[in-house]
């Protein structure tokens, strides 16, 4: 029963798409279990760049089963746009299955998301305005529409009309904005439902059967641990659980069916949107990392905030995910720096703090305590083995390992699939 969960162990954008794509070559099944199309992941195949927001990364392999699990919030319009891209590339899409339990994102979710964020003023939380939070809100208050209900043409109209009436009251009376016309939305989404119906099934059965048959199953994470609604830097978080604990629920499997948890971390730290960031470099060093690493959001295009590797943070995410291994991404970006820094503690009101605070006000008062390591000048993008890496690069990797307490089994030295150093195979 080989099964691997891939989680982002920072604030998202760690490079999960590349590692999932790499491991998907050997997997039989790839499963997404949370989030929606608010998170983007980029995959390079030869010189072709693919950006996905909702589809699992295994879709580029026609012999893999790709599952969008019950914990995902599903944007039909976004899904069909990504399907169209694959079809234009001649890629078969019959290997994609969507759980009938996913909650559907409608235009009113996106509008409310936008209006709520604008109403926050200076207290904005950095939402992507994709309707993710409002959709999860409907799910929790048990008023949402699930995909299995959307493809049921007998019930869908009544369900949607009631939701549009309710949401128009919020949009028009609270935010004084223009609401939606029910019939037009119904006709559009009925068309989507008919196109999507062939992909819809009970995917919990497929996941269980694959694991029972001891197939290689890859659980694909979106966003990052510190965006978890419970364990992240609240309120600057997402509305789901991008931690390892979210996968059993979001895919409909038992927790004992997960064997390995691989944490994806950048060799430095980035963040998109608002919130405290202890190791942020708001200077020319941060700018250099941003430009070399092409640190701009896949979904929003926003420049990412950049900083040194925060070991305190990653030690926290290692603990709450139960990481069994790490993959260190974008190590090549750090070539050419005379000195590198790793945060190994925080100073809080004159005291040394070794743990990541739960309260963001406390976190905002923390100043990073750094260990300095010598950098390297060599271009490492064509290196294939760990032994080839410069000595200082190896010392940097080994210091992260020793501090965090988890082995780094994969190292990325470039965006392409073949620019990956494997220290120990996972599948």
From Swiss-Prot:
<dbReference type="GO" id="GO:0005737">
    <property type="term" value="C:cytoplasm"/>
</dbReference>
<feature type="binding site">
    <location>
        <begin position="330"/>
        <end position="332"/>
    </location>
    <ligand>
        <name>GTP</name>
    </ligand>
</feature>
<dbReference type="Pfam" id="PF00709">
    <property type="entry name" value="Adenylsucc_synt"/>
</dbReference>
<keyword id="KW-0479">Metal-binding</keyword>
<dbReference type="InterPro" id="IPR001114">
    <property type="entry name" value="Adenylosuccinate_synthetase"/>
</dbReference>
<feature type="binding site">
    <location>
        <position position="13"/>
    </location>
    <ligand>
        <name>Mg(2+)</name>
    </ligand>
</feature>
<dbReference type="InterPro" id="IPR027417">
    <property type="entry name" value="P-loop_NTPase"/>
</dbReference>
<dbReference type="GO" id="GO:0005525">
    <property type="term" value="F:GTP binding"/>
</dbReference>
<feature type="active site" description="Proton acceptor">
    <location>
        <position position="13"/>
    </location>
</feature>
<dbReference type="InterPro" id="IPR042109">
    <property type="entry name" value="Adenylosuccinate_synth_dom1"/>
</dbReference>
<feature type="binding site" description="in other chain">
    <location>
        <position position="238"/>
    </location>
    <ligand>
        <name>IMP</name>
    </ligand>
</feature>
<dbReference type="GO" id="GO:0004019">
    <property type="term" value="F:adenylosuccinate synthase activity"/>
</dbReference>
<feature type="binding site">
    <location>
        <position position="40"/>
    </location>
    <ligand>
        <name>Mg(2+)</name>
    </ligand>
</feature>
<keyword id="KW-0460">Magnesium</keyword>
<dbReference type="InterPro" id="IPR033128">
    <property type="entry name" value="Adenylosuccin_syn_Lys_AS"/>
</dbReference>
<comment type="subunit">
    <text>Homodimer.</text>
</comment>
<keyword id="KW-0658">Purine biosynthesis</keyword>
<keyword id="KW-0963">Cytoplasm</keyword>
<keyword id="KW-0342">GTP-binding</keyword>
<feature type="binding site" description="in other chain">
    <location>
        <position position="302"/>
    </location>
    <ligand>
        <name>IMP</name>
    </ligand>
</feature>
<dbReference type="GO" id="GO:0000287">
    <property type="term" value="F:magnesium ion binding"/>
</dbReference>
<dbReference type="InterPro" id="IPR042110">
    <property type="entry name" value="Adenylosuccinate_synth_dom2"/>
</dbReference>
<feature type="binding site">
    <location>
        <position position="304"/>
    </location>
    <ligand>
        <name>GTP</name>
    </ligand>
</feature>
<comment type="function">
    <text>Plays an important role in the de novo pathway of purine nucleotide biosynthesis. Catalyzes the first committed step in the biosynthesis of AMP from IMP.</text>
</comment>
<feature type="binding site" description="in other chain">
    <location>
        <position position="223"/>
    </location>
    <ligand>
        <name>IMP</name>
    </ligand>
</feature>
<keyword id="KW-0436">Ligase</keyword>
<comment type="similarity">
    <text>Belongs to the adenylosuccinate synthetase family.</text>
</comment>
<protein>
    <recommendedName>
        <fullName>Adenylosuccinate synthetase</fullName>
        <ecNumber>6.3.4.4</ecNumber>
    </recommendedName>
</protein>
<feature type="binding site">
    <location>
        <position position="142"/>
    </location>
    <ligand>
        <name>IMP</name>
    </ligand>
</feature>
<feature type="binding site" description="in other chain">
    <location>
        <position position="128"/>
    </location>
    <ligand>
        <name>IMP</name>
    </ligand>
</feature>
<feature type="active site" description="Proton donor">
    <location>
        <position position="41"/>
    </location>
</feature>
<feature type="binding site">
    <location>
        <begin position="12"/>
        <end position="18"/>
    </location>
    <ligand>
        <name>GTP</name>
    </ligand>
</feature>
<comment type="pathway">
    <text>Purine metabolism; AMP biosynthesis via de novo pathway; AMP from IMP: step 1/2.</text>
</comment>
<feature type="binding site">
    <location>
        <begin position="412"/>
        <end position="414"/>
    </location>
    <ligand>
        <name>GTP</name>
    </ligand>
</feature>
<dbReference type="GO" id="GO:0044208">
    <property type="term" value="P:'de novo' AMP biosynthetic process"/>
</dbReference>
<feature type="binding site" description="in other chain">
    <location>
        <begin position="13"/>
        <end position="16"/>
    </location>
    <ligand>
        <name>IMP</name>
    </ligand>
</feature>
<dbReference type="InterPro" id="IPR018220">
    <property type="entry name" value="Adenylosuccin_syn_GTP-bd"/>
</dbReference>
<feature type="binding site">
    <location>
        <begin position="298"/>
        <end position="304"/>
    </location>
    <ligand>
        <name>substrate</name>
    </ligand>
</feature>
<feature type="binding site">
    <location>
        <begin position="40"/>
        <end position="42"/>
    </location>
    <ligand>
        <name>GTP</name>
    </ligand>
</feature>
<dbReference type="InterPro" id="IPR042111">
    <property type="entry name" value="Adenylosuccinate_synth_dom3"/>
</dbReference>
<keyword id="KW-0547">Nucleotide-binding</keyword>
<feature type="binding site" description="in other chain">
    <location>
        <begin position="38"/>
        <end position="41"/>
    </location>
    <ligand>
        <name>IMP</name>
    </ligand>
</feature>
């Amino acid at each position: 029963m080989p099964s691997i969960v891939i989680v982002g162990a920072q604030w998202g954008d760690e490079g999960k798409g590349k590692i999932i794509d790499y491991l998907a070559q050997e997997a039989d099944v790839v499963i997404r279990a949370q989030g929606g199309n608010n998170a983007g992941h980029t995959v390079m195949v030869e010189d072709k760049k693919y950006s996905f927001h909702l589809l699992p990364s295994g879709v580029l392999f026609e012999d893999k089963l790709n599952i969008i699990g019950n914990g995902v919030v599903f944007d039909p319009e976004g899904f069909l746009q990504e399907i169209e891209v694959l079809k234009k590339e001649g890629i078969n899409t019959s290997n994609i299955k969507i759980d009938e339990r996913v909650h559907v994102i409608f235009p009113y979710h996106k509008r409310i998301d936008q209006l709520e964020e604008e109403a926050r003023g200076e207290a904005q939380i950095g939402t992507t305005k994709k309707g993710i939070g409002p959709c999860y809100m409907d799910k929790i208050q048990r008023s949402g529409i699930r995909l299995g209900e959307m493809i049921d043409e007998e019930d869908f109209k009544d369900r949607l009309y009631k939701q549009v009436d309710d949401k128009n009251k919020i949009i028009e009376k609270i935010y004084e904005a223009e609401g939606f016309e029910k019939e037009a939305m119904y006709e559009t989404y009925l068309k989507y439902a008919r196109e999507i119906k062939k992909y819809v099934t009970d995917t919990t059965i497929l996941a269980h059967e694959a694991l029972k048959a001891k197939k290689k199953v890859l659980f694909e994470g979106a966003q990052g641990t510190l965006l978890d609604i419970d364990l992240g830097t609240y309120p600057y978080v997402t509305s789901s659980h991008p931690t390892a604990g979210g996968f059993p629920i979001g895919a409909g499997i038992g927790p004992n069916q997960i064997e390995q948890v691989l944490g994806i971390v950048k060799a430095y730290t980035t963040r998109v949107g608002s919130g405290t960031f202890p190791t942020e470099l708001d200077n020319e060093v941060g700018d250099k990392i941003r430009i070399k690493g092409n640190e701009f959001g896949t979904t929003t295009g926003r420049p990412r905030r950049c900083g040194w590797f925060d070991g305190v943070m990653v030690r926290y995410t290692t603990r709450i995910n139960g990481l069994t291994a790490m993959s260190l991404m974008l190590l090549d970006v750090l070539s050419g720096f005379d000195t590198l820094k790793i945060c190994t503690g925080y100073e809080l009101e004159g005291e040394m703090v070794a743990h990541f605070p739960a309260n963001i006000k406390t976190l905002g008062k923390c100043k990073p305590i750094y260990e300095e390591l010598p950098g390297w000048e060599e271009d490492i993008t064509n290196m294939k083995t760990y032994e080839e890496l410069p000595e200082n690069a190896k010392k940097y990797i080994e210091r992260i390992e020793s501090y965090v307490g988890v082995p780094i089994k994969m190292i990325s030295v470039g965006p392409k699939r073949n620019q990956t150093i494997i220290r120990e195979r996972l599948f």
